[in-house]
């Protein structure tokens, strides 16, 4: 009956799920996902960077933009090689638990800045941006390597950008 029990169990299940899916070309990532007409942008960054805020700005200023997940979406490489993102039972500051998916068009790593500037990341920078947003277990070599491989495979298809930005319409 203690609400903290539910929170603990929910977080534990989320962590176990994130580790269990690794060998199946899937990643649980820390991101906010905005969808527009079947295509998705994933906003990455550390907690407090503005991922939820940026997704909210897209919904405010871009007609038909919707929120797919606000905190812990699932990224998956499908059998045909397509990279898709899925909603899941874990949301963030904005409750959003959609049983839906979208084609991933880009990953955008956010950084707060007084100026808005978009830069395409390459090589190690793009890898670090996505890898640091994934859930993995260092002590489980098989799953850790599977996560590593899936990140590399995603990056062969999906561009990664860094968006230095203010929380305003111009950043959208």
Regions found by a protein language model. Name each.
Residues 49-50:
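Conserved glycine(s) of the Walker
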Residues 20-36:
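Pre-Walker A adenine-sensing motif
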Residues 1-18:
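Charged, amphipathic alpha-helical linker segments immediately N-terminal to NTP-binding catalytic cores
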Residues 17-21, 152:
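Generic structural signal for well-ordered alpha-helical scaffold segments
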């Amino acid at each position: 009956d203690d609400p903290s029990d539910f929170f603990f169990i929910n977080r534990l299940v989320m962590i176990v799920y994130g580790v269990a899916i690794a060998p199946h070309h899937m990643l649980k990532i820390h991101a906010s996902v905005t969808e527009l007409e079947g295509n998705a942008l994933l906003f990455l960054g550390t907690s407090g960077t503005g991922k939820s805020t940026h997704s909210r700005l897209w919904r405010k200023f871009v007609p038909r933009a919707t929120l797919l997940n606000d905190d812990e979406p699932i990224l998956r490489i499908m059998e045909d090689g397509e990279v898709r993102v899925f909603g899941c039972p874990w949301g963030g500051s904005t409750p959003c638990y959609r049983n839906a998916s979208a084609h991933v068009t880009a990953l955008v790593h956010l950084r707060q800045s007084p100026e808005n500037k978009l830069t395409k990341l390459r090589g190690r920078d793009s890898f670090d941006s996505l890898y640091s947003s994934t859930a993995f277990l260092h002590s489980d070599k098989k799953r850790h390597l599977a996560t590593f491989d899936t990140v590399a495979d995603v990056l062969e298809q999906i561009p990664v950008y860094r968006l230095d930005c203010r929380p305003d319409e111009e950043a959208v």
